[in-house]
């Protein structure tokens, strides 16, 4: 079968597959002399030949996995195989043992040309005659029908081909050198060995009959791209035994453990905010690694390369092998990580700007970009200041006002705020001029009558121009004491109306006015216009306020 037992088992848990070859779980419902009847959750009962239950006696209620051979054998029965399921599981276990180099148990069941057939838990394997023992054996009959240990030396499940060796087992068990080495090996022991093989993840070291694994992470305290960068087959190395599993005869070795850990007390040698020199060892899309000393590297993240170019690729700032000055930003000794910065070794343009300029100062720059929330103005030091939509015009909405600008335009603005730590400069264009709304509000007399001009009129309200760039709102109820249902029947755009201010909403920049407040009532209830002098312009209001102060 091409699928492993683990794959078939997983599939049996997630889906119901009724095709021949599918693995399903079955429960014994009846045991007969020639067959075993099981319930496998199929349309009909399953039949398993009794011959497949060798060396075991099935009982009603027993559960096990079976393979579907035929969903209908012509008699309304489903033919199942316990043996094929057992073999699928056996193949999976043999594959694990083969990859791990572990021994397996089997029985020599017959002689064939050139060797023997070995039963490895329902899987047949070939044992070459030359691999039966460490020396030639004339009559190996004494080994037949006995469970003994073998080592798999070749395996191909698709071709149903397994080759085993008893000789390899005996050599491992009877090697005097190996036994002696195994007995003397201790964790923490320093020993010499020879590099036997190199892989992507490490190197195998011959310690004298015993092989140990020197993992790539235990070769050096620093970064190792590939074991072949440090070692060659045949090299004699000095290593330390890190871990020794006597039962599985596995040895883990280390080279870097022979030297002091460079990360120990590293904060004393590299205090945070200290500036040091290092060599660029690796460049990635997210930053560059800088070697501070043997076994100690730190990362300069892309955001810490340059003050103004946040998304610049590291390769445009540094080169591999280049010596650079860096500042230690953060140290995590436990995780063996150091965060470094290159830009911190240069003057901060945001801080320089803050030292040279003050709030409310006027500056000039060119529009670099326009966004949904405002526009960025280029300033000295290759930094930007933001003019928010709300700071472009006093009278127009930000969305309308920003249409008057395009990229490259030179504009003048007022500095509203400088925040070097957050790298932000707030600018305003409307602040170049006084706020007509606030100037009007601060100058008007509560009892003053204003001659306003109708700008817009609807049935329930009207918008009036109180002064240049200052508008007020008058509701229908504030127009007159008389019964009026529709302002459009009383007022036209351009009409002048005498009004008084009845409310000012500074937060929402809204002025409510009333014509009714200007009117008076006679004793008979007739309407009269108040004798309060009429002020027609903002200038008149300011002039009157100044005169009242002088008096």
Curated annotation (Swiss-Prot):
Q: Name one GO molecular function term.
A: mRNA binding
Any one GO CC term of this protein is: cytosolic small ribosomal subunit
Q: Which family does it belong to?
A: Belongs to the bacterial ribosomal protein bS1 family.
Tell me which UniProt keywords the record has, alphabetically.
Repeat, Ribonucleoprotein, Ribosomal protein, RNA-binding
| Function text | Binds mRNA; thus facilitating recognition of the initiation point. It is needed to translate mRNA with a short Shine-Dalgarno (SD) purine-rich sequence.
Q: Which residues form the S1 motif domain?
A: 21-83, 101-167, 188-256, 273-343, 360-430, 447-516
From the broadest rank down, the organism's phylogenetic lineage runs: Bacteria, Pseudomonadati, Pseudomonadota, Gammaproteobacteria, Legionellales
- The yes or no answer to whether the keyword Transmembrane is present is no
User: Matching Gene3D superfamilies, A to Z?
Assistant: Nucleic acid-binding proteins
Task: Please give the name of this protein.
Answer: Small ribosomal subunit protein bS1
Name its GO BP terms in alphabetical order: translation
